[in-house]
Each structure stands twice: as C-alpha cells, then as structure tokens.
Amino acid sequence: MRTILLFCLALGSASVSAQETGMHRVQRIFEAGRDGYYTYRIASLVSTARGSLLAFCAARKGTGGDWDPIDIVMRRSTDGGRQWEPMRVLVPGGAKPSDNATPIVDQVTGQVHLLYQTDYARCFYRQSSDDGMTWSEPVDITSVIEGFRSVYPWVVLAPGPGHGIQLRSGRLVVPFWLSDGGQREFGPNHRGHRPSIVVSVYSDDHGRSWRAGAVAVPDNDTTVVPNETSCIELADGRVLFNTRNESPNYRRLLTYSPDGATGWSTPVFADAFFEPICFGSMVRVSQIPDQSKNRILFCNPDSRQDPWKAAKPATPRSAPNRHRVNLTVRMSYDEGRTWPVSKVIDPGVAGYSDLAVTPDGMIHCFYEGGTIEGTGGNHFKNTHMSVVSFDLAWLTDGADRPSRGDKPFRTPAVR
C-alpha cells in the first residue's frame, strides 16, 4: 500500500531582489510556531529527475531539541521554487524523534529514495516514483547498520542529513554517523550523540537492498567527534565525504574513496572550509563534457570573523561551537582543489543548509535562519527555513554563466 499525498498550490513568503547582475530570489517556506510546531530544522533538498524540488525538514515540538517529538515534513515545488505546495507530514514521529531525512535522486529509474531515522535507533527506507506525490510504505533497514557493530558499539544512528548521491555507476551512496552514546550530553535519560564516527552505506540495485560500506572517518584526537557529512562524486570517479567535526582547528574534514563504500583515505583538514561545528552541504553544478566547465558548490556558515564563542574553553577533545552566522556559498572549478568564488547568501543567523540544481541552471539553497525571540539569540531555535534561488551570474557577479551548448546537468549514470 502506498501513502497518497494530496496537494494544493500555495505561494510562500517571497522576495525577489533586483540585482545588477543575475537572478536572486528568497522564499520562506517554513515558519516557527505554525501548524503546531515550535520550530523547523535540518534541511534536505533535491531536484528530481523531472525537475521538481522536494524540501524535507524536521518539524519539532516541545522546545525544539534533538530528543523532543519530531515529525519529518516536506514541501514540493514543480516550477523551480516559485510556488510551493502545502506542507505534508511524511513521517509522524509521535512522542519520539523522527529526523535526518536523506533523499537520493535516481536518474536511472526516476525514483526518489529516502532514508531517515526514528528515535536515533532505527533506520527506514521509502521511495517515490512520482516526484514525491506518493511514497512507499517504510522498510526497516536497521539490520544493515548492525553490520558496523563488529567495529563500533553504536547506540545512536543517523543518516546524512542533507542529500545522498548517485554515482556514474548507478550506485547510491549515503553517509551515516554513529555514536556509542557515552558522553550523555542530553542528560541521564537520553543517549548521547558523542563521541561518533562516520560510515558509508550504499545500494547497487536502486534501493531494493542496502549494504554497509566501511568506516570513513574514525574518532580520535585528530578528527574529534566526526558526524554529519555531505558527499559528492568527483570527475575522476572518487567519492568525497565532507565532514563536520569538533576539532579546535575549526576546519572541515575531507576523506576520499574510489567507490563510495570502502578504501577511505586518511581524513585531512580543509583550509578552505571554516567549521563552526555545523552541517555543511555540497552539490555539483556542471561537469565536462556535458557542460563547458566543472563546477562544485559548498555552503555553510563561515563565522570565522565572528567573535562569539561558548563559555567553555577549547580543549583537544572539546571545541565550543562558533556562532552560526554568515551563510556562505563557495564554488570550485577544479574539483575542490581551490575555491575562488565566495558569496554570502545570508549575513544573519543561519545554520544547516542543503543545495540543489534544477534543469534551468538555477541553484537552490534550503537553510535554517533566524532565532526565536526570547531565546537569547540561540541559533538552535530558528524562526524560519527559507529557499534562496540564484544563478551563476548572481553568484559570480557576472563573471560566469552557462555556455550556449551546455546540457542540463544530470548524473551521467550508465546502468
């Protein structure tokens, strides 16, 4: 049986700014306090094989914490983000958290695959064959993650968040983070999310079955609590994991695999990417030969100039969060070796984000913004989640545009 979602069109709160060069549009599509939820967090965004945008997030009750009651909700746009259908509850969490929606677009079958967790203890899989209008019943795939118990005694699991990827081989790849719960930072009644490691999970049959890969980023005195990870396939076929961590270096961790499953390289810190201890997102915009240039984007809060820090001092195993402000998108033309383009898309409070590209070449960033009044500027308690849409001309102040012969970008899978 399939769950049928019925939609009506609804226009979100929108603003289109007149720019000297390029196109730039912002829409608030989730607002704190609406529909019985305290706040909305944890952005996931994909552009489907047909070009629809699907925006998933965590609708949080209580005080918006990780262990409060959480539903997974979704909104859908079929016109490049100009109009958004009403919010639908995709996964009701009940009294427990359901979170970390991680969609993957399958360019071969046209399906959208979705992984998510419930109570940080079980992982489920669903798929849609009609651009998110209907979804299959949940399938429990926790047994796949059990395969990592031989190398790590986890008690907490979570995919993504953000989106997973499809490789040119057709393989689907999703990063997971696992924790042994030892720190108990949420108190005695909840399993902790620290320490943690990052692992890979994959499917070679379009989501019909899933397999455990290998540990991509272990936890040690260098990597320091690696967890939420974004990923991308490079032009040479390697898969890059870009990982949040709590090292006092305040830099992202990068590790590479030849196939997205095993053979992960020793993680290294990326000087180009400031790490405020927050999820950051990646997406490919174009790739030779279908387009004239290779282009990759990365987005996170670049708050390196912000003086705010938590009261506790940094230690080798405990770096305090930096303020989540100054959401910045960067672009690389050489598969991540250098990042010459940088532009702030929100100078205010902004946290988790996810990126997607529609066939018209527009780039879309779905992100958390603002702080609820009376919370002392707490960046974990967002007032809204917005989608900002822009083109290459806006991002580069007119220095870069698609070439005349460029094809709409699609993962060039061969199966």
Model-predicted regions and their roles:
Residues 8-17:
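Hydrophobic h-region of N-terminal signal peptides that target proteins for export
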Residues 1-4:
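Positively charged n-region of N-terminal signal peptides that target proteins for export
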